[in-house]
Design a protein with these regions (language model features):
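Short active-site oxyanion
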Residues: 8, 61, 87-89
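Conserved substrate/cofactor phosphate-moiety recognition/catalytic segment
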Residues: 11, 16-72
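Alpha-helical elements of Rossmann-like donor-binding domains used by nucleotide-donor carbohydrate transfer enzymes
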Residues: 50-51, 76, 120, 124
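Conserved GTP-binding G-domain of TRAFAC-class P-loop NTPases and closely related GTPase folds
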Residues: 1-11, 16, 27-28, 83, ...
Length: 160
């Protein structure tokens, strides 16, 4: 059992640090669900949602490690969290296209995404907001020392 059931949604471009952040900061106490783990599945969205629902029903925290660029991807996840009484936390990785393309170019095999895929995600990428249904939002950036800087995002209307 957990004190607070949580669904974490990572939001950002490919090669923005989401998976590294996930494994360093969340994987110890969250089930990691990523469509990358079942690329050959016939219905990856359906499989992802089944895993999310099963974990939350078992009172297990979940992190969804995909690009999740827009409300179209968030809404079903936020809905699942609500059904199970979970808090929805968004981790926003602001786009840095040149750096993401450089990191992506250094990847090998199936982990490398064609550049057109990164550009397509950038076109759809939207900063998450509390009005989208998130209970908490954080902005995640590289700290320049091999780690991450995580800062709470203020509610809309109160941004510095």
């Amino acid at each position: 059992m957990v004190d607070e059931l949580e669904l974490a949604i990572l939001i950002g471009l490919q090669a923005s640090g989401k998976t590294t952040f996930c494994h360093r900061m969340l994987a110890d106490d969250h089930l990691v669900v990523s469509k990358d783990a079942f690329r050959n599945a016939r219905h990856p969205q359906r499989r992802q949602m089944r895993l999310v629902h099963e974990a939350l029903a078992a009172r297990r925290c979940v992190v969804v490690d995909n690009t999740n660029p827009s409300p179209q991807e968030w809404e079903p996840l936020i809905g699942a969290a609500r059904v199970h009484g979970a808090v929805t936390v968004g981790y926003w990785f602001p786009p840095d296209l040149p750096a993401a393309l450089d990191r992506n170019a250094a990847r090998e095999g199936r982990s490398r995404v064609p550049d057109v895929g990164v550009y397509d995600t950038l076109k759809r990428l939207r900063r998450p907001r509390y009005v989208d249904g998130f209970d908490r939002l954080y902005e995640v950036r590289f700290d320049g020392k091999g780690g991450f800087r995580v800062e709470p995002m203020p509610p809309e209307g109160r941004q510095p």
